[in-house]
From Swiss-Prot:
Top EC group: ligase
Gene this protein is translated from: hisS
Broad class of the protein's primary localization: cytoplasm
Domain of life: Bacteria
Source organism per UniProt: Synechococcus sp. (strain JA-3-3Ab) (Cyanobacteria bacterium Yellowstone A-Prime)
GO function terms (MF aspect): ATP binding; histidine-tRNA ligase activity
The protein's name in its UniProt record: Histidine--tRNA ligase
Record family assignment: Belongs to the class-II aminoacyl-tRNA synthetase family.
Length: 419
C-alpha cells in the first residue's frame, strides 16, 4: 500500500527540532512577560471578510494566497494568513479597548498561505507576534522594535539588520501612490508581469519586486519619504531618536512598504543575509486605522511578527542544537509480577520529579541494560519476579557500574538524597 505523506507545503517538526522551537518560545515568554505583554489565543478559522477588510482585497494575500471555503451554513471562512487582524477582531469583540488603557498582547501559532514552497516559506507556517494597541506615542514603536531585537539576539541570531521606513498617514500614501502610478504607467511594458498586474491593484508592492530590472526602474522613480507631511516626518524622526537612545542600529530603506494594506507610518523588517531570498525574519509596523476599519473606535496600534520557520532555519545554520531532556532513571523489569510493579515504580519516580523511562520491551535484562546505557540515564532500576516478591529493586549507577539492593519503599527517598 502506498505511503501517505504530508501535504505539499507542510512539514513535520520532529522531536530534535522541536527542542529548538521550545527554546525560542520560552525566551519569548520570558522577554515579553518582562514587558507585561499578555498572551492571546485566537481561532485559526476566521470569516473571510475580516481579511478582505484588513489586509486589503487587492493584496496578493487575499487575492491569491488564502485558503477559503464555504461552511454548511454558507459562511465564507478562511484559514488565517496572519494574526494581526484576528487579534484586533478579538480586541473589539471582547471590549478590551478600555478608555486610556494600552493593551500589550502576544501570540504564537500556525498561519496558512498558498505559496510556492521553498526553504523558509511553507504553506503552513508559524508566527510569533506582538500587538501594542492604544498608543500613538513613538516610544511604542521603539518598544516593540526593541523587544523583537532583544528576542532575536537572546536566542542566538546574529548578523541582523533592522530596515526602517515611514509610510506616512493615508493622505501621504495616496499622494505617493499617485506619483508612483504616474511614473510607472509609461514604463509598464518594461516591468515584470507581476508588477504590471500590481500597477493596477496595489502599486506600492512593485517596490518589493524581486525582479532586478523592475527594482532598477522603481528606484529611479519617486521616493516615499519625499511625500511625507511635516507631522509624519516629525513622528518618524522621534522613532529614530528613541532607537538611537536604545543603541539599536538601523538602516533607512525608502522602498520598504510591507505587503499588507493596513500599515501606516512606521514600517520595519529585521533581515539576515544568511537566509538568501527569504531574508526577512521579523516584519511589522504601525496600523493606526485598522481597529476603526474593523468596527472599533479609532485606536492607534503597532506590532510585528517573527517567522519561526525562518528563525529556526537561521539558528540551524549556526549548527545550534538543544540537547535532549536527559533521562535520569531507566526502569527495567522481567517477569509478569515485576512488569506490573515496574509501572508503579516509574510513576512514583515521575511524581517525585525524576525524568523516568520505562522499558516496555520485555526482552532479556542484558538488552534492557544496553538500552538504559544508550538513553543517557544515571540510574537503572531493575527487578525480576524475585525482587517483586521481596518488595525490592536492584539499583545500578550506570556511570560507575556500582549496584545495590534497595527496598522499593526506600527507592525514591534514596534517589532524592543522591541528587
Amino acid at each position: 500500500m502506498e505511503m501517505i505523506q504530508a501535504v505539499r507545503g507542510t512539514r513535520d517538526i520532529l522531536p530534535q527540532e522541536v527542542r529548538l522551537w521550545q527554546q525560542v518560545e520560552a525566551s519569548a515568554r520570558e522577554i515579553l512577560g518582562r514587558a507585561n505583554y499578555q498572551e492571546i489565543r485566537t481561532p485559526i478559522l476566521e470569516l473571510t471578510e475580516l481579511f478582505a477588510r484588513s489586509i486589503g482585497s487587492a493584496t496578493d494575500v487575499v487575492g491569491k494566497e488564502m485558503y477559503s471555503f464555504s461552511t454548511r451554513g454558507e459562511q465564507e471562512v478562511s484559514l488565517r494568513p496572519e494574526n494581526t487582524a484576528g487579534v484586533v477582531r478579538a480586541y473589539i469583540q471582547h471590549g478590551l479597548q478600555v478608555a486610556g488603557d494600552v493593551q500589550r498582547l502576544w501570540y504564537c501559532g500556525p498561519m496558512f498561505r498558498y505559496e510556492r514552497p521553498q526553504a523558509g516559506r511553507q504553506r503552513q507556517f508559524h508566527q510569533l507576534g506582538v500587538e501594542l494597541l492604544g498608543s500613538r506615542d513613538p516610544r511604542a514603536d521603539a518598544e516593540v522594535i526593541a523587544l523583537a531585537w532583544d528576542l532575536l539576539r537572546a536566542v542566538g541570531a546574529e548578523n541582523l539588520t533592522l530596515r526602517l521606513n515611514s509610510l506616512g498617514d493615508p493622505q501621504d500614501r495616496r499622494a505617493y501612490r499617485q506619483a508612483l502610478v504616474d511614473y510607472l504607467t509609461p514604463l509598464k511594458e518594461e516591468l515584470d508581469l507581476d508588477s504590471q498586474e500590481r500597477l493596477v491593484r496595489n502599486p506600492l508592492r512593485i517596490l518589493d519586486s524581486k525582479d532586478p530590472h523592475t527594482r532598477t526602474i522603481a528606484e529611479q522613480g519617486p521616493k516615499l519619504p519625499d511625500y511625507l507631511s511635516a507631522d509624519s516626518r516629525a513622528f518618524f524622526e522621534q522613532v529614530q531618536a528613541h532607537l538611537q537612545a536604545l543603541d539599536i542600529p538601523y538602516e533607512l530603506d525608502p522602498y520598504l512598504v510591507r505587503g499588507l494594506d493596513y500599515y501606516t507610518h512606521t514600517a520595519f523588517e529585521i533581515v539576515s543575509p544568511e537566509l538568501g531570498s527569504q531574508s526577512t525574519v521579523c516584519g511589522g509596523g504601525r496600523y493606526d486605522g485598522l481597529v476603526e476599519e474593523l468596527g472599533g473606535p479609532p485606536t492607534p496600534a503597532v506590532g510585528w511578527a517573527i517567522g519561526l520557520e525562518r528563525l529556526v532555519l537561521l539558528l540551524q545554520k549556526k549548527q545550534q542544537e538543544i540537547p535532549p531532556t536527559s533521562v535520569e532513571v531507566y526502569v527495567i523489569s522481567r517477569g509478569a509480577k515485576a512488569e506490573a510493579q515496574s509501572l508503579q515504580i516509574a510513576q512514583a519516580l515521575r511524581q517525585a520529579g525524576f525524568c523516568t523511562e520505562l522499558d516496555l520491551s520485555g526482552s532479556a535484562f542484558s538488552k534492557q541494560f544496553k538500552r538504559a546505557s544508550r538513553s543517557g540515564a544515571t540510574w537503572a532500576v531493575a527487578l525480576g519476579d524475585a525482587e517483586a516478591a521481596a518488595g525490592e529493586v536492584q539499583l545500578k549507577h550506570l556511570p560507575t557500574g556500582q549496584q545495590q539492593t534497595l527496598l522499593q519503599a526506600d527507592l525514591v527517598k534514596y534517589l532524592v538524597s543522591q541528587r
